Design a protein with these regions (language model features):
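Flexible "arm" and connector segments at domain edges
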Residues: 1-83, 88-160
Length: 160
């Protein structure tokens, strides 16, 4: 995190509508029910590997909705649906992983949210820290430098 700007600090200042959190919690609860005993037989049998094709298909369907004649504004309902399908895949994969012990690579959707939030804050020090980048080109350059450093740090951790 950049100069004391943690994700909790950032979230506190964002004013995320309560409705957003409620809807997300509902989605997670529905997936929990689908994967639980007495839930859906098909959903309960899925693995990361079996779900990959659906994630790819849904991502392509988002692209199609964006590129459709008239653009995303003309097809907002379709785009909402397709983005929901991609979000479902994130929640689904997270739920599958949650069923595994943490020591064996398990995680939950809160871990995914924490990781992406931290990454966005870390890669935007011009917004959340003391760095400056006022043009899109400067932002892209800074982003590339931060991403390269993250790769180097990951490689060093693997070698350790």
């Amino acid at each position: 995190m950049s100069q004391g700007h943690g994700t909790d600090d950032v979230a506190a200042g964002l004013g995320v509508p309560e409705r957003t959190g409620q809807r997300f919690a509902e989605l997670v609860a529905v997936m929990d029910r689908l994967r639980s005993p007495g839930g859906c037989a098909w959903d309960g049998q899925q693995t990361h590997e079996s779900l990959v094709r659906y994630l790819v298909e849904e991502a392509y369907e988002v692209v199609e909705a964006v590129e459709a004649e008239g653009g995303p504004a003309a097809h907002a309902g379709l785009l909402v649906e397709e983005l929901g399908d991609v979000l479902l895949q994130v929640v689904f994969h997270s739920r599958v992983a949650q069923e595994r012990p943490r020591a064996e690579g398990g995680f939950d959707v809160a871990d995914v949210l924490e990781a992406i939030t931290a990454k966005l804050v870390r890669r935007h020090p011009h917004v959340f820290g003391d760095s400056t980048a006022s043009t899109p080109a400067e932002v892209e350059e800074q982003w590339a430098q931060i991403k390269a450093q993250e790769r180097a740090d990951r490689a060093a951790r693997r070698e350790a």
